[in-house]
Amino acid sequence: MSDQIKFIVDSLNKEPFKKNYNLITFDSLGPMQLLQVLNDVLAEIDPKQDVDIREETPEQTAKRMLSLLGILKYKPPGNATDMSTFRQGLVIGSKPVIYPVLHWLLQRSSELKKRAYLARFLIKLEVPSEFLQDETVADTNKQYEELMEAFKALHKECEQLKTSGFSTAEIRRDISAMEEEKDQLMKRVERLKKRVETVQNHQRMLKIARQLRVEKEREEFLAQQKQEQKNQLFHAVQRLQRVQNQLKSMRHAAADAKPESLMKRLEEEIKFNSYMVTEKFPKELESKKKELHFLQKVVSEPAMGHSDLLELESKVNEVNAEINQLIEKKMMRNEPIEGKLSLYRQQASIISRKKEAKAEELQETKEKLASLEREVSVKTNQTREFDGTEVLKGDEFKRYVSKLRSKSTVFKKKHQIIAEFKAEFGLLQRTEELLKQRQETIQHQLRTIEEKKGISGYSYTQEELERVSALKSEVDEMKGRTLDDMSEMVKKLNSLVSEKKSALAPVIKELRQLRQKCQLTQECDEKRTQYDSCAAGLESNRSKLEQEVRGLREECLQEESKYHYTNCMIKNLEVQLRRATDEMKAYVSSDQQEKRKAIREQYTKNITEQENLGKKLREKQKAVRESHGPNMKQAKMWRDLEQLMECKKQCFLKQQSPASIGQVIQEGGEDRLVL
């Protein structure tokens, strides 16, 4: 109880109550103050409960709190008699009643807020059946039930969206970005429309463009179907290969094996399968059923808090301790008799456990073998699709590895030579750049000097003359060469070309294969990038379209709610208009019978009747006031007379009693002797 009070005080001192209590001040609160604290906690859960209990009677306060606690599904401890004491304690503000309620409410405040909010919309209003005979009331009640179901669906969807990780800020940013993009697209469309309208036959061109778009979509759809059919064919080929491998393995086993070994293997499989079916699977099924039964039982029970769980854990520990004690007593009582039986039982349980472990290990090994076989078939299919060859095995694979190693060494050498050439080329390119820069600076300096001296263009003309003379000398040299030199050179070149061709023939052949593979890898990379970009674009388009669909659905729901609301208002106005027209017809009608049916006539008749009744009552009141004084005197006289008669009766009874015989009674100044 002290922990309960401490938790209540700590919770009341926090937000949003800020009561600033301690254990002593909280324990010293009176009944009215405790009820006000309870009402404040209930008002935090349901704002409708925010009232001052001093303005209510205790019965009204208790009724209001009990109704809200019933909605929140609070279960008071005890049976029906305890329920009556609970109600009485709630009326008078009893601490043993209010403390558990406060503890329960403060433990589950967030959950109870949600429950109170939902109860405001989901508690159905009970309409009497006689009122439902009216069509308007029945239609309104039906719309009310439909709106309640729609609220349930929307609330469920809202909770799913809250738990899905979408934030409202991100959604708003996305909506604003989409609106901006929509405006930009609309502007672009308008500009394109204006630009297209000036072109001749633009309608025909638009029609052709529309047909082109439809055909492209159809082409994409057909490509998608083709890809799906390829996937189906690939899966079918995989299944065929798997079945062929199984058939091959079975044929191989049948070719090598004898009938005795086959029968032995089949007997082992039958034993294993019968054990799995008769012993292992029924036990697992029974355990799963028990677990399912326990889970269903837990789900059907109301939600429990931390204190309830601690209480259940303590009960479970106590029961386990009692079970252990009983087992120890039984073992002590039956130990000399059942010594051998317990030994046999232990051995049987050990053997059964080993059997179960081996069965599980065998099952796991079979599953692992099947998965490895599937993986091998997938890898073989991938290699066959990549280069169209079968997977190498044994000596072929070794020869392929040795050949690949020799080629890799040659490739490394060639790669090293290419790297050296690249480095030399970079060095020469850098020196060329430096020389060009230096030449430009010298040319610039030379031009400035020529401009200063007044002979601009001299260096250019001199360079041209030198170039022309050099060309002329080269031409002269070329003319001076003899035909013998040319023939020798041709022979040398031909011999060199033939040698190089013979030396480079295997390299060119290997290079051609490598180039084909490189082209395939490049095409694969290009296709992969195209696929990734296309997938990203389609994903973004899909997300945009989903957001647009969600927004349009929300708009549709809003428009539907507006439509239902306007229909209700129209029906109400039609009913009022019908009543007003009926009233006007009855009021304007010359028939007195119709006029009597009019509401105005009925109200005027009721008013006159009430006025006459008021006059009669005022006259009666006046008569009562006039006769009030005499009647009060008369009533007083009657009461005095009753007292006098009662006194005489008492005196007479005293005279008649036997105790008064022989006594002298003096009354009214006279002496009497009663015999």
UniProtKB/Swiss-Prot annotation:
Residues 132-258, 306-389, 433-453, 509-627 form a coiled coil. Its main location: other. It comes from the Eukaryota. The keyword RNA-binding does not apply. The modification Phosphothreonine is found at T61. Residues 2-121 are annotated as: CH (calponin-homology)-like region. One of its GO terms (molecular function) is tubulin binding. The modification N-acetylserine is found at S2. It is found in: Cell projection, Cilium; Cytoplasm; Cytoplasm, Cytoskeleton, Cilium basal body. One of its GO terms (cellular component) is sperm midpiece. GO terms for biological process: cilium assembly; intraciliary transport; intraciliary transport involved in cilium assembly; regulation of smoothened signaling pathway; sperm flagellum assembly; spermatogenesis. Component of the IFT complex B, at least composed of IFT20, IFT22, IFT25, IFT27, IFT46, IFT52, TRAF3IP1/IFT54, IFT57, IFT74, IFT80, IFT81, and IFT88. Interacts with IFT74; the interaction is direct: within the IFT complex B, IFT74 and IFT81 mediate the transport of tubulin within the cilium. Interacts with tubulin; the interaction is direct. Interacts with IFT57 and IFT70B. Interacts with RABL2/RABL2A; binding is equal in the presence of GTP or GDP. Interacts with IFT88. Interacts (via the IFT74/IFT81 heterodimer) with RABL2B. Interacts with CFAP61. The CH (calponin-homology)-like region shows high similarity to a CH (calponin-homology) domain and mediates binding to the globular domain of tubulin. Component of the intraflagellar transport (IFT) complex B: together with IFT74, forms a tubulin-binding module that specifically mediates transport of tubulin within the cilium. Binds tubulin via its CH (calponin-homology)-like region. Required for ciliogenesis. Required for proper regulation of SHH signaling. Plays an important role during spermatogenesis by modulating the assembly and elongation of the sperm flagella. This is Intraflagellar transport protein 81 homolog. It comes from Rattus norvegicus (Rat).
